[in-house]
Curated annotation (Swiss-Prot):
Full protein name: Argininosuccinate synthase
A Pfam family this chain is assigned to: Arginosuc_synth
Subunit (UniProt): Homotetramer.
Record keyword Cytoplasm present: yes
Species: Buchnera aphidicola subsp. Schizaphis graminum (strain Sg)
Sites where the protein binds L-citrulline: Y89, N125, R129, S178, S187, E263, Y275
GO terms, biological process: argininosuccinate metabolic process; L-arginine biosynthetic process; urea cycle
GO cellular component: cytoplasm
Upper lineage: Bacteria, Pseudomonadati, Pseudomonadota, Gammaproteobacteria, Enterobacterales
Gene: argG
Amino acid sequence: MNNFKKVVLAYSGGLDTSAIIPWLKENYHVDVVAFVADIGQSKKDLNGIEKKALQSGAIDCRVFDLKEEFIKDYVYPVLKTGSLYEGNYLLGTAIARPIIAKKQVEFASSIGAKFLCHGATGKGNDQVRFEIAYAALAPYMKVIAPWREWNLNSRESLLEYLREKNIPTSATLEKIYSRDENSLHISTEGGLLEDLWNKPNADCWNWTVELEDAPEQPEYISLIVKNGSVVSVNNEFLTPLKCIEKLNKIGSKHAIGRIDIVENRLVGIKSRGCYETPGGTIMHIALRAIEQLVFDRESFKWREKIGLEMSSVVYDGRWFTPIRKSLQASADSLSSEVNGEVVLKLYKGSVIPVQKKSSNSLYSKEYATFGEDEVYKHSDAEGFIRLFSLSSRIRAQNKLK
Protein backbone atom coordinates (compact mmCIF):
# COMPACT_ATOMS: atom_id res chain seq x y z
CA MET A 1 0.00 0.00 0.00
CA ASN A 2 1.08 3.57 -0.58
CA ASN A 3 2.36 5.43 2.46
CA PHE A 4 -0.30 8.10 2.81
CA LYS A 5 0.09 10.67 5.57
CA LYS A 6 -3.29 11.85 6.79
CA VAL A 7 -6.83 10.63 6.10
CA VAL A 8 -10.04 12.38 7.14
CA LEU A 9 -12.74 9.82 7.90
CA ALA A 10 -16.46 10.67 7.97
CA TYR A 11 -16.99 9.12 11.39
CA SER A 12 -20.29 8.14 13.01
CA GLY A 13 -19.01 6.29 16.05
CA GLY A 14 -20.78 3.13 14.96
CA LEU A 15 -19.29 -0.32 14.54
CA ASP A 16 -18.28 0.15 10.91
CA THR A 17 -16.37 3.41 11.21
CA SER A 18 -14.83 2.31 14.53
CA ALA A 19 -13.33 -0.67 12.69
CA ILE A 20 -12.27 1.49 9.75
CA ILE A 21 -9.84 3.53 11.87
CA PRO A 22 -7.51 0.63 12.82
CA TRP A 23 -7.98 -0.92 9.37
CA LEU A 24 -6.75 2.28 7.70
CA LYS A 25 -3.74 2.42 9.99
CA GLU A 26 -2.91 -1.23 9.36
CA ASN A 27 -3.41 -1.28 5.61
CA TYR A 28 -2.54 2.26 4.54
CA HIS A 29 -0.09 3.26 7.30
CA VAL A 30 -1.79 6.60 7.86
CA ASP A 31 -2.79 9.01 10.57
CA VAL A 32 -6.58 9.03 10.81
CA VAL A 33 -8.52 12.16 11.75
CA ALA A 34 -12.19 11.54 12.57
CA PHE A 35 -14.67 14.08 11.21
CA VAL A 36 -18.11 14.09 12.86
CA ALA A 37 -21.04 16.00 11.36
CA ASP A 38 -23.73 16.81 13.92
CA ILE A 39 -26.83 17.07 11.76
CA GLY A 40 -29.33 16.22 14.47
CA GLN A 41 -28.66 12.58 15.22
CA SER A 42 -29.38 11.22 18.70
CA LYS A 43 -27.35 12.75 21.52
CA LYS A 44 -26.45 9.26 22.69
CA ASP A 45 -24.68 8.74 19.35
CA LEU A 46 -22.60 11.87 19.95
CA ASN A 47 -21.89 11.51 23.67
CA GLY A 48 -18.28 10.46 24.12
CA ILE A 49 -17.69 10.16 20.39
CA GLU A 50 -14.32 11.94 20.53
CA LYS A 51 -13.07 9.47 23.17
CA LYS A 52 -14.37 6.55 21.14
CA ALA A 53 -12.53 7.74 18.02
CA LEU A 54 -9.26 8.17 19.91
CA GLN A 55 -9.62 4.73 21.51
CA SER A 56 -10.05 3.30 18.03
CA GLY A 57 -6.73 4.84 16.99
CA ALA A 58 -7.55 8.25 15.51
CA ILE A 59 -5.04 11.01 16.21
CA ASP A 60 -7.83 13.56 16.48
CA CYS A 61 -11.62 13.87 16.33
CA ARG A 62 -13.53 17.03 15.47
CA VAL A 63 -17.29 17.47 15.87
CA PHE A 64 -19.02 20.14 13.79
CA ASP A 65 -22.51 21.41 14.65
CA LEU A 66 -24.19 21.65 11.23
CA LYS A 67 -27.83 21.34 12.25
CA GLU A 68 -28.98 24.89 11.46
CA GLU A 69 -27.08 25.04 8.18
CA PHE A 70 -28.38 21.61 7.20
CA ILE A 71 -32.03 22.61 7.57
CA LYS A 72 -31.66 26.16 6.24
CA ASP A 73 -29.45 25.53 3.19
CA TYR A 74 -30.34 21.97 2.22
CA VAL A 75 -33.70 20.82 3.61
CA TYR A 76 -35.68 24.04 3.14
CA PRO A 77 -34.58 24.55 -0.49
CA VAL A 78 -35.60 20.99 -1.39
CA LEU A 79 -38.96 21.34 0.37
CA LYS A 80 -39.64 24.35 -1.86
CA THR A 81 -39.41 22.12 -4.92
CA GLY A 82 -42.01 19.64 -3.65
CA SER A 83 -39.60 16.75 -4.23
CA LEU A 84 -40.83 13.26 -3.38
CA TYR A 85 -38.63 10.40 -4.58
CA GLU A 86 -40.85 7.81 -6.27
CA GLY A 87 -43.87 9.66 -4.96
CA ASN A 88 -43.27 8.93 -1.27
CA TYR A 89 -39.84 9.67 0.12
CA LEU A 90 -38.91 13.16 1.37
CA LEU A 91 -35.20 12.35 0.87
CA GLY A 92 -34.24 12.55 4.55
CA THR A 93 -31.06 10.49 4.22
CA ALA A 94 -30.06 11.62 0.73
CA ILE A 95 -30.28 15.34 1.48
CA ALA A 96 -27.87 14.98 4.42
CA ARG A 97 -24.98 13.64 2.36
CA PRO A 98 -23.99 16.83 0.47
CA ILE A 99 -23.39 18.90 3.60
CA ILE A 100 -21.41 16.09 5.26
CA ALA A 101 -19.20 15.67 2.20
CA LYS A 102 -18.74 19.42 1.75
CA LYS A 103 -17.72 20.04 5.35
CA GLN A 104 -15.49 16.96 5.32
CA VAL A 105 -13.64 18.29 2.27
CA GLU A 106 -13.32 21.75 3.82
CA PHE A 107 -11.95 20.28 7.04
CA ALA A 108 -9.52 18.03 5.18
CA SER A 109 -8.24 21.02 3.23
CA SER A 110 -7.83 23.07 6.41
CA ILE A 111 -5.49 20.49 7.97
CA GLY A 112 -3.61 19.70 4.78
CA ALA A 113 -5.05 16.21 4.30
CA LYS A 114 -5.27 14.88 0.77
CA PHE A 115 -7.25 11.73 1.45
CA LEU A 116 -10.91 11.16 2.30
CA CYS A 117 -12.64 8.08 3.63
CA HIS A 118 -16.27 7.09 4.21
CA GLY A 119 -17.96 4.05 5.71
CA ALA A 120 -20.66 3.51 3.08
CA THR A 121 -21.15 -0.06 1.90
CA GLY A 122 -20.66 -1.27 -1.66
CA LYS A 123 -24.37 -2.06 -1.96
CA GLY A 124 -25.82 1.30 -1.06
CA ASN A 125 -26.48 4.75 -2.45
CA ASP A 126 -24.27 6.64 -0.02
CA GLN A 127 -20.98 5.54 -1.58
CA VAL A 128 -22.11 7.22 -4.80
CA ARG A 129 -23.44 10.32 -3.06
CA PHE A 130 -20.26 10.89 -1.09
CA GLU A 131 -17.91 10.27 -3.97
CA ILE A 132 -19.82 12.40 -6.48
CA ALA A 133 -19.57 15.26 -3.98
CA TYR A 134 -15.88 14.60 -3.40
CA ALA A 135 -15.27 14.61 -7.15
CA ALA A 136 -17.12 17.90 -7.59
CA LEU A 137 -15.45 19.66 -4.66
CA ALA A 138 -11.98 18.13 -4.46
CA PRO A 139 -11.10 16.02 -7.50
CA TYR A 140 -7.45 16.04 -6.44
CA MET A 141 -8.17 14.15 -3.21
CA LYS A 142 -7.95 10.36 -3.12
CA VAL A 143 -10.93 8.44 -1.77
CA ILE A 144 -10.64 5.29 0.31
CA ALA A 145 -13.77 3.12 0.55
CA PRO A 146 -12.97 0.22 2.92
CA TRP A 147 -16.22 -1.64 2.26
CA ARG A 148 -15.09 -2.14 -1.34
CA GLU A 149 -11.71 -3.47 -0.23
CA TRP A 150 -11.82 -5.39 3.04
CA ASN A 151 -13.22 -8.82 3.84
CA LEU A 152 -14.97 -7.73 7.04
CA ASN A 153 -18.40 -8.26 5.56
CA SER A 154 -20.44 -9.16 8.63
CA ARG A 155 -21.17 -7.77 12.07
CA GLU A 156 -19.47 -10.80 13.57
CA SER A 157 -16.25 -10.22 11.64
CA LEU A 158 -16.18 -6.52 12.54
CA LEU A 159 -16.57 -7.30 16.25
CA GLU A 160 -13.86 -9.95 16.06
CA TYR A 161 -11.52 -7.51 14.30
CA LEU A 162 -11.97 -4.92 17.06
CA ARG A 163 -11.32 -7.59 19.69
CA GLU A 164 -8.11 -8.56 17.93
CA LYS A 165 -7.01 -4.92 18.00
CA ASN A 166 -7.97 -4.56 21.69
CA ILE A 167 -10.33 -1.71 20.83
CA PRO A 168 -13.28 -1.34 23.23
CA THR A 169 -16.76 -1.25 21.76
CA SER A 170 -20.28 -1.26 23.14
CA ALA A 171 -21.59 -2.88 19.96
CA THR A 172 -23.06 -6.39 20.15
CA LEU A 173 -24.51 -8.97 17.82
CA GLU A 174 -28.00 -8.02 19.00
CA LYS A 175 -28.36 -5.02 16.69
CA ILE A 176 -30.37 -6.09 13.68
CA TYR A 177 -31.46 -2.77 12.19
CA SER A 178 -29.56 -0.14 10.27
CA ARG A 179 -30.66 3.36 11.26
CA ASP A 180 -29.89 6.84 9.97
CA GLU A 181 -31.04 9.88 11.91
CA ASN A 182 -30.88 13.63 11.45
CA SER A 183 -33.03 16.67 12.24
CA LEU A 184 -35.36 15.90 9.33
CA HIS A 185 -35.97 12.18 9.66
CA ILE A 186 -34.98 8.78 10.93
CA SER A 187 -34.84 5.63 8.80
CA THR A 188 -34.87 1.97 9.83
CA GLU A 189 -33.76 -0.79 7.46
CA GLY A 190 -32.70 -4.43 7.65
CA GLY A 191 -33.73 -7.03 10.20
CA LEU A 192 -37.26 -8.36 9.80
CA LEU A 193 -37.95 -5.70 7.14
CA GLU A 194 -35.87 -7.67 4.65
CA ASP A 195 -38.80 -10.10 4.35
CA LEU A 196 -41.47 -8.04 2.61
CA TRP A 197 -44.24 -10.15 4.12
CA ASN A 198 -43.24 -9.17 7.65
CA LYS A 199 -45.17 -6.32 9.18
CA PRO A 200 -43.08 -3.61 10.85
CA ASN A 201 -43.02 -4.06 14.61
CA ALA A 202 -42.57 -1.45 17.33
CA ASP A 203 -38.77 -1.58 16.95
CA CYS A 204 -39.10 -0.29 13.38
CA TRP A 205 -40.44 3.06 14.56
CA ASN A 206 -38.49 5.45 16.74
CA TRP A 207 -40.02 8.93 16.69
CA THR A 208 -43.71 8.49 16.01
CA VAL A 209 -46.42 6.76 18.02
CA GLU A 210 -48.64 4.02 16.64
CA LEU A 211 -51.83 5.25 14.97
CA GLU A 212 -53.87 3.55 17.67
CA ASP A 213 -51.95 5.44 20.36
CA ALA A 214 -52.32 8.87 18.76
CA PRO A 215 -54.72 11.31 20.48
CA GLU A 216 -58.42 10.75 19.94
CA GLN A 217 -58.90 14.48 19.42
CA PRO A 218 -57.38 16.39 16.47
CA GLU A 219 -54.92 19.22 16.93
CA TYR A 220 -54.99 22.37 14.81
CA ILE A 221 -51.79 24.26 14.05
CA SER A 222 -51.08 27.43 12.09
CA LEU A 223 -48.06 27.88 9.83
CA ILE A 224 -46.93 31.10 8.17
CA VAL A 225 -45.09 30.70 4.89
CA LYS A 226 -42.78 33.27 3.32
CA ASN A 227 -41.14 32.79 -0.08
CA GLY A 228 -41.87 29.08 0.00
CA SER A 229 -40.46 28.48 3.49
CA VAL A 230 -42.18 27.91 6.81
CA VAL A 231 -41.16 30.75 9.14
CA SER A 232 -43.71 30.51 11.95
CA VAL A 233 -45.45 27.77 13.91
CA ASN A 234 -48.54 28.79 15.88
CA ASN A 235 -47.64 32.47 15.47
CA GLU A 236 -44.15 31.95 16.88
CA PHE A 237 -41.45 33.01 14.42
CA LEU A 238 -38.55 30.56 14.54
CA THR A 239 -35.36 29.64 12.74
CA PRO A 240 -35.67 26.83 10.17
CA LEU A 241 -34.14 24.35 12.62
CA LYS A 242 -36.48 25.36 15.43
CA CYS A 243 -39.46 25.14 13.05
CA ILE A 244 -38.61 21.59 12.03
CA GLU A 245 -37.86 20.54 15.60
CA LYS A 246 -41.17 21.92 16.86
CA LEU A 247 -43.13 20.27 14.07
CA ASN A 248 -41.28 16.98 14.62
CA LYS A 249 -42.44 17.03 18.23
CA ILE A 250 -46.02 17.93 17.35
CA GLY A 251 -46.25 15.53 14.42
CA SER A 252 -44.70 12.56 16.21
CA LYS A 253 -47.45 12.39 18.81
CA HIS A 254 -50.04 12.27 16.01
CA ALA A 255 -48.24 9.45 14.11
CA ILE A 256 -47.54 11.76 11.18
CA GLY A 257 -44.85 11.14 8.58
CA ARG A 258 -44.59 7.33 8.71
CA ILE A 259 -43.95 5.44 5.50
CA ASP A 260 -42.99 1.81 4.87
CA ILE A 261 -41.71 1.66 1.30
CA VAL A 262 -39.70 -0.37 -1.18
CA GLU A 263 -37.52 1.96 -3.24
CA ASN A 264 -35.23 1.64 -6.22
CA ARG A 265 -31.67 2.26 -5.12
CA LEU A 266 -29.28 4.01 -7.45
CA VAL A 267 -27.15 0.85 -7.70
CA GLY A 268 -30.09 -1.19 -8.99
CA ILE A 269 -31.14 -2.97 -5.80
CA LYS A 270 -34.62 -2.62 -4.36
CA SER A 271 -34.60 -1.94 -0.63
CA ARG A 272 -37.24 -1.61 2.05
CA GLY A 273 -37.23 1.04 4.73
CA CYS A 274 -39.43 2.51 7.43
CA TYR A 275 -39.03 6.29 7.34
CA GLU A 276 -40.34 8.84 9.82
CA THR A 277 -40.45 12.50 8.76
CA PRO A 278 -43.14 14.18 10.85
CA GLY A 279 -42.08 17.83 10.58
CA GLY A 280 -41.08 17.56 6.95
CA THR A 281 -44.41 15.96 6.06
CA ILE A 282 -46.33 18.77 7.74
CA MET A 283 -44.25 21.39 5.92
CA HIS A 284 -44.62 19.63 2.56
CA ILE A 285 -48.41 19.60 2.83
CA ALA A 286 -48.55 23.20 4.07
CA LEU A 287 -46.46 24.49 1.16
CA ARG A 288 -48.55 22.63 -1.39
CA ALA A 289 -51.69 24.17 0.16
CA ILE A 290 -50.39 27.72 -0.40
CA GLU A 291 -49.25 26.79 -3.91
CA GLN A 292 -52.84 25.86 -4.75
CA LEU A 293 -53.79 29.47 -4.14
CA VAL A 294 -50.98 31.31 -5.90
CA PHE A 295 -49.89 29.14 -8.86
CA ASP A 296 -51.70 29.23 -12.17
CA ARG A 297 -51.96 25.97 -14.13
CA GLU A 298 -48.67 26.33 -15.98
CA SER A 299 -46.75 27.36 -12.87
CA PHE A 300 -48.18 24.41 -10.97
CA LYS A 301 -47.21 21.97 -13.71
CA TRP A 302 -43.73 23.46 -13.88
CA ARG A 303 -43.24 23.15 -10.13
CA GLU A 304 -44.29 19.51 -10.34
CA LYS A 305 -41.69 18.92 -13.06
CA ILE A 306 -39.04 20.63 -10.95
CA GLY A 307 -39.95 18.45 -7.98
CA LEU A 308 -39.83 15.25 -10.01
CA GLU A 309 -36.41 16.04 -11.47
CA MET A 310 -35.00 17.40 -8.21
CA SER A 311 -36.00 14.23 -6.36
CA SER A 312 -33.75 12.18 -8.65
CA VAL A 313 -30.94 14.74 -8.53
CA VAL A 314 -30.89 14.71 -4.73
CA TYR A 315 -31.37 10.95 -4.43
CA ASP A 316 -28.50 10.33 -6.83
CA GLY A 317 -26.16 12.69 -5.00
CA ARG A 318 -25.91 15.26 -7.78
CA TRP A 319 -26.14 18.24 -5.44
CA PHE A 320 -23.04 20.07 -6.64
CA THR A 321 -24.07 20.16 -10.30
CA PRO A 322 -25.40 22.80 -12.71
CA ILE A 323 -28.74 21.00 -13.06
CA ARG A 324 -29.38 21.13 -9.30
CA LYS A 325 -28.53 24.83 -9.21
CA SER A 326 -30.77 25.51 -12.20
CA LEU A 327 -33.69 23.60 -10.72
CA GLN A 328 -33.23 25.42 -7.43
CA ALA A 329 -33.12 28.82 -9.12
CA SER A 330 -36.37 28.07 -10.92
CA ALA A 331 -38.03 26.85 -7.72
CA ASP A 332 -36.84 29.93 -5.83
CA SER A 333 -38.32 32.16 -8.52
CA LEU A 334 -41.70 30.43 -8.32
CA SER A 335 -41.62 30.42 -4.53
CA SER A 336 -41.30 34.18 -4.32
CA GLU A 337 -45.11 34.21 -4.63
CA VAL A 338 -45.67 31.41 -2.10
CA ASN A 339 -46.61 33.53 0.90
CA GLY A 340 -49.50 33.03 3.26
CA GLU A 341 -50.94 31.21 6.23
CA VAL A 342 -52.41 27.74 6.49
CA VAL A 343 -54.20 26.00 9.34
CA LEU A 344 -53.72 22.24 9.44
CA LYS A 345 -55.74 19.55 11.17
CA LEU A 346 -53.51 16.80 12.59
CA TYR A 347 -55.27 13.55 13.39
CA LYS A 348 -54.02 9.96 13.56
CA GLY A 349 -51.41 10.15 10.82
CA SER A 350 -53.22 12.63 8.59
CA VAL A 351 -52.42 16.26 7.84
CA ILE A 352 -55.40 18.13 6.41
CA PRO A 353 -55.34 21.81 5.38
CA VAL A 354 -58.59 23.32 6.63
CA GLN A 355 -57.91 27.06 6.24
CA LYS A 356 -55.53 28.91 3.93
CA LYS A 357 -54.97 32.43 2.70
CA SER A 358 -52.42 34.41 0.73
CA SER A 359 -52.04 38.00 -0.39
CA ASN A 360 -50.97 36.55 -3.76
CA SER A 361 -53.97 34.25 -4.07
CA LEU A 362 -55.49 33.91 -7.54
CA TYR A 363 -58.69 32.58 -6.04
CA SER A 364 -61.59 35.01 -6.38
CA LYS A 365 -64.85 34.26 -4.63
CA GLU A 366 -66.60 36.66 -7.01
CA TYR A 367 -65.60 34.52 -9.99
CA ALA A 368 -65.79 31.10 -8.33
CA THR A 369 -69.24 31.43 -6.74
CA PHE A 370 -72.04 29.07 -7.77
CA GLY A 371 -74.46 31.83 -6.96
CA GLU A 372 -75.33 34.89 -9.01
CA ASP A 373 -72.40 37.11 -9.92
CA GLU A 374 -71.76 40.27 -11.90
CA VAL A 375 -68.17 39.65 -13.07
CA TYR A 376 -68.31 36.50 -15.18
CA LYS A 377 -70.10 36.40 -18.52
CA HIS A 378 -71.14 32.82 -19.24
CA SER A 379 -71.46 33.62 -22.92
CA ASP A 380 -67.69 34.26 -23.08
CA ALA A 381 -67.13 30.53 -22.68
CA GLU A 382 -68.66 29.77 -26.09
CA GLY A 383 -65.83 31.35 -28.07
CA PHE A 384 -63.20 29.85 -25.81
CA ILE A 385 -64.64 26.35 -26.18
CA ARG A 386 -64.83 26.70 -29.96
CA LEU A 387 -61.16 27.66 -30.21
CA PHE A 388 -60.05 25.13 -27.59
CA SER A 389 -61.81 22.32 -29.46
CA LEU A 390 -60.76 23.45 -32.94
CA SER A 391 -58.20 20.69 -33.55
CA SER A 392 -60.69 18.04 -32.40
CA ARG A 393 -63.33 19.50 -34.70
CA ILE A 394 -61.00 19.50 -37.73
CA ARG A 395 -59.86 15.94 -36.99
CA ALA A 396 -63.45 14.73 -36.87
CA GLN A 397 -64.30 16.57 -40.11
CA ASN A 398 -61.35 14.91 -41.86
CA LYS A 399 -62.69 11.49 -40.92
CA LEU A 400 -66.04 12.35 -42.51
CA LYS A 401 -64.50 13.16 -45.92
